[in-house]
Amino acid sequence: MPTTTQIQAWAERLRHAEATATPIAPLREEITDNDSAYAVQLVNVQYAQSQGRRIVGRKIGLTSLAVQKQLGVDQPDFGTLFADMLYGDDEAVPLSRTLQPKVEAEVALVLAKDLERPDTTLVDVISATAYVLPAIEIVGSRIADWNIRFIDTVADNASSGLVVLGAVPTALNALDLKLCQMQMTRNGDVVSTGSGGACLGHPLNAAVWLARRLANLGQPLRAGDLVLTGALGPMVAVNAGDRFEARISGIGSVCAQFEG
């Protein structure tokens, strides 16, 4: 197990990469186990909190087989969302806020109840969900050229960047999320398609996985938390001036407009 000093040093390296907009070499040659990678992530989450940033939820990453194939990984991970990451529908998003940005369309849940049990069930998640929103997650990597494997993205807060949320909530009981179809356009051209079934078979399966994982860590999901359940299709690179629109059947649409 790495020493506390080593964990702190890896975490600082990632912070420096973000602060200087200079991606770094992969960390997987130095961080050799998943627990250590999550320890690095936690150090930077705690550092962010010490700087006044407010946690508003969690994201689940690597739930789509298409995204897993793109990145060469084979299991989900999770990261932390902060209030200053969130943008509203069609709000201008500065491109400079994210290193090597890419976008993916997702289903977002907002919780009405805590999910504290390590044996959380699908029924528990359904009961705890206040509503769903369409979302565009803007992922970013502090690792050069997106040359990542599981350990790299975990340490890097699951490659979190920003989130653009739709503004019209939909009740879960009005939806079959597995059958929801997603289409995302960039400047009017279709660039990504998928469905709810691409997200661990069902977006709520991803939420169950996350609730159990966090409960076991003593960091359970709480009422009011935002949960990004994972990509519904392949992620797409972003350029200055791009406008993305994601439409998810039954849930609605959300737009992300990028400034230079």
UniProtKB/Swiss-Prot annotation:
One of its GO terms (biological process) is 3-phenylpropionate catabolic process. Its EC number is 4.2.1.80. The lineage of its organism: Bacteria, Pseudomonadati, Pseudomonadota, Betaproteobacteria, Burkholderiales. This is 2-keto-4-pentenoate hydratase. Catalyzes the conversion of 2-hydroxypentadienoic acid (enolic form of 2-oxopent-4-enoate) to 4-hydroxy-2-ketopentanoic acid. PANTHER family: 2-KETO-4-PENTENOATE HYDRATASE (PTHR30143:SF0), ACID HYDRATASE (PTHR30143). It catalyses: (S)-4-hydroxy-2-oxopentanoate = (2Z)-2-hydroxypenta-2,4-dienoate + H2O. GO terms for molecular function: 2-oxopent-4-enoate hydratase activity; manganese ion binding. Its cofactor is a divalent metal cation. Pathway: Aromatic compound metabolism; 3-phenylpropanoate degradation.
